[in-house]
């Protein structure tokens, strides 16, 4: 015997079964948990890829320090969360928590560097990093999870 399509309701009256598309159901779930990882990969996955953008399809942010050696950027979530979430950053290269794979261009040394969560609200996360020198540019490759569980 196989059972599918359960619907639980409060009260004594049963209503018609509510059908939702995959996209609608996913959007409702993302109010509680969201990840940038491709489907089928868990948080912190080690792609062990010199060029992580080929395999893991990470978030890529360009940072430029103008008058200081630190900078910050706001990154929006796919859907608004039910509460301010706990955000964890992972390197797109090897899954190291709290770091991003940093491409520093010609003459620079590519490596994992810290990418810090400065502030979270229901709509976005503010991320910050140190670039090491004024006017130095870098690209940060990372994944994230955002948890706003009950």
Regions found by a protein language model. Name each.
Residues 37-42, 48-150:
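Phosphate/adenylate-binding glycine loop and adjacent helical scaffold
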